[in-house]
Amino acid sequence: RKAKRRVTALGLKNVEDLAVMDAEKLEFPDNSFDVVMAQYVVTAVPNPEAALDEFSRVLRPGGELIILTRISADAGLRRFIERRLQPVVRPLGFRTAEFTWSRYAQWLATAGEMELVENRPIPPLGHFSLLRIRKTAIAVAA
């Protein structure tokens, strides 16, 4: 409701519609969008891979999934610190220590029709990253 009021108050004519739905079960047909933008979503949903699969499903071939998120270190001091902080930040809804780059890479390897275009750390500290992932083809059912 707040977003709809804001669209009206600001006169945002480019916003056609707003909808609330489960990121793991999107109510859109296959191949609906040229771009899917997921800001700080992947680490907040119960089953991130299911959400990533849904984002891929609703993308048209050639479309891009743009993710802005926190990506944890796979190893080293930063990984140690992130794991130590996890009990403190998890009750706040942050599961960032669970989301290393290798988890995204594993999803990409199994997603089939998705390819990484860009993985850019966001300044100043690089704890957040911008991922651009392109859908290369329509998935074929097995």
Where are the predicted features?
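Class I SAM-dependent methyltransferase SAM/SAH-binding core
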Residues: 1-25
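Short conserved AdoMet
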Residues: 11, 46, 60
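A short acidic, Gly/Pro-enriched loop at the edge of an enzyme's catalytic core
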Residues: 21-35
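A short glycine-rich, Lys/Arg-flanked "PGG" loop and its adjoining helix->strand segment in the class I
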Residues: 49-61
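C-terminal alpha-helical "lid/dimerization" subdomain adjacent to the S-adenosyl-L-methionine
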Residues: 68-124, 129
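C-terminal lobe and adjacent flexible extensions of AdoMet/dcAdoMet transferase-like proteins
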Residues: 130-142
